[in-house]
Amino acid sequence: TLGNHDFNYGQETLTDYLNALHARCLCGNVRDENGRLPVGSYTVHTLKNGLRVGLVGMTTSWINLWEKPENLAGLSVGDPFHTAVKGALALKDRVAVPVGIYHGGCEKELETGKTLSETDENIACRLCEKLPFDLLLTGHQHVAMVNQNYHGTHVVQTPANAVAYVKVTLDEDGRFESELLTPKAEAV
C-alpha cells in the first residue's frame, strides 16, 4: 500500500514508481480523478496449495493534513475504515484468509487496550475490533511488532527504513507466527 511519504515527491514520481513496481499496489482510499495512479482496493491471490488469500489496502487519511496541496491535486485520500469495510465485504465468502494492509498504526496498546490516541490518524485497533481480518500488516509508527494479537487478528509492523522485515507463517491449524528478520546485503 502507499504510505504518507510516498506523496512527498509529487504525483509524477509516485506514478513512475508504481508503474515500475513489479507488484500490484492496493490502496483503496486513494482516488485519482485523472486515472494515472495504478492502485486497486483489494485482490484475491490463490497460493500454490490452493489457499485463497484476500488482501485489502489502505493508508492513513492524515495525508490530507500533512502533504503539500500541489502533491495531492486531483487526488483524494478518503476514510481508510470505510475502504476496509468495503473490501472486507467484497472478499466475504471468497477467501480463506482475509488480510488488511494498512499504512497506519495502533491507537491502543495491544496488550491492555489502553488508548494511546484519540485521533483517527491510526486506526489499526478499530480495524481489528470491527472487521474479520485474520492478519493486519501495519506501518507508519515504525515500531517493530511481531506475534501480537488483538481481537483475534494477528498484527505486525516493521521498523523504519527497511532495517528489518516481518516474515509471517500460517500453520495448517490456522495459527500465525511472525518474526522480525534483518535483510542481508550481497554484492552484485
Residue ranges and their predicted role:
Residues T1-A187:
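Acidic, metal/ion-coordinating pockets
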